[in-house]
Structure formats: C-alpha cells, structure tokens
Amino acid sequence: TYVNYRLWLGSNKKIIEKLEEKYNVKIDKSRKLEENVFVDIDEEFEWPDVNNNIYKTSGKCYGIRDHVGILVDGSVVPCCLDGNGSIKLGNIFESSLDSILNSKRALKMVEGFKNKKLEEELCKHCGFIEKINKN
C-alpha cells in the first residue's frame, strides 16, 4: 500500500505548504516524501469521462499492466483514474486478484494496450492517455 498525492502545477500552493510542513521537506517537483508516500506535481490533464470531448481509439497506457485500483466496495478497476468504477473487472471480496486480472475483459485490455488499441470506452475519453502518448 502506498499514498500518492497528485497535485496540479500552480494551483495547490496551500496543500504543498502543508505537506512541506508535515514532512519537513521542500517540494518543488515530484518526489518521495517517506516510505510508501509520494507527491506527484504535474500539468493538469482532463480526467477520464465518457462525456468529455476527448476521443481516441489508439494509445498506450500503464493501467492494469503496472497498477490497478481497488475501490472501497472492493471493485477492482484498471487504474487509479477510474474512481467511479466504470470499468469494474471484478470484486476483491468475491474473487482473487489473480483471477480478476486473468479475466477475459482484463486480458483484452492488456492485449489492446500492447497493440496501442483502447478497448474500453472510458479509456477512449482519457486525458492522461493523451498526455503519456505525447512522450
């Protein structure tokens, strides 16, 4: 388990000051604050939402490959940006993580990302995917 504070550049001065005070460090870039606690300061991107104006069918992503999210109700989602559980792969209270990650839907997403194909509708509307595919 770890904590990652995600902050946008320029708009979180008070939060950064509080974190600097708590962890007794100067925060001017993304960094480790202590064991399993990080701060990520970056340019703002549009949060995934099927109702936004972003629409891409191709691109790479680190979701499900490098990390997953587990919501409070036990829903396993492919990334930390799916806070509403739009892409529920399974439930950790009902199935093992291994079986969830080896489900047909999860494997289809992994294969799609390998081939730079976005399989899920939410992924097609993700501003973070736009951001990482610029690099």
Which ranges hold each PLM region?
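Radical SAM enzyme [4Fe-4S]-AdoMet core and its adjacent flexible, acidic
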Residues: T1-N115, I129-K134
